[in-house]
Amino acid sequence: MNKLLIGLVNVYKKFISPVLPPTCRYYPTCSTYMIDALKKHGAILGLIMGISRIIRCNPFIKGGVDPVPDYFTLRRNPHPERYEDEIIAQAFHSNKK
């Protein structure tokens, strides 16, 4: 189930997202957040967290850095600074070329 959900999000990222204007107010983007939540918390809790994040991502909020926390929550990550090194490492030291 988890692989199926991640696959669906990847299809969205590859084929649908490039056609739409960028609107996500968070880093990482909502689709990346969904994948990270699915990997970290499994299909059910990860899906719930990802949907909660998509609902939070709207024009009436400030946005900002909001990585997936290590525990289940439907709220914004209260301590994104704890994940700052991990985010920087992923963004700048990726093995992808």
Curated annotation (Swiss-Prot):
Task: Name the protein family.
Answer: Belongs to the UPF0161 family.
What's one GO-annotated cellular component? plasma membrane
Q: Name one Pfam family in it.
A: YidD
Compartment annotation: Cell membrane
Task: Please tell me the species this chain comes from.
Answer: Lactobacillus gasseri (strain ATCC 33323 / DSM 20243 / BCRC 14619 / CIP 102991 / JCM 1131 / KCTC 3163 / NCIMB 11718 / NCTC 13722 / AM63)
In UniProt terms, what function does this protein have? Answer: Could be involved in insertion of integral membrane proteins into the membrane.
Q: How does it sit in the membrane?
A: Peripheral membrane protein
Note the PANTHER family from the entry: MEMBRANE PROTEIN INSERTION EFFICIENCY FACTOR-RELATED (PTHR33383:SF1)
Give start-end of the signal peptide. none
This chain's protein is named Putative membrane protein insertion efficiency factor
Q: What is its main location?
A: membrane
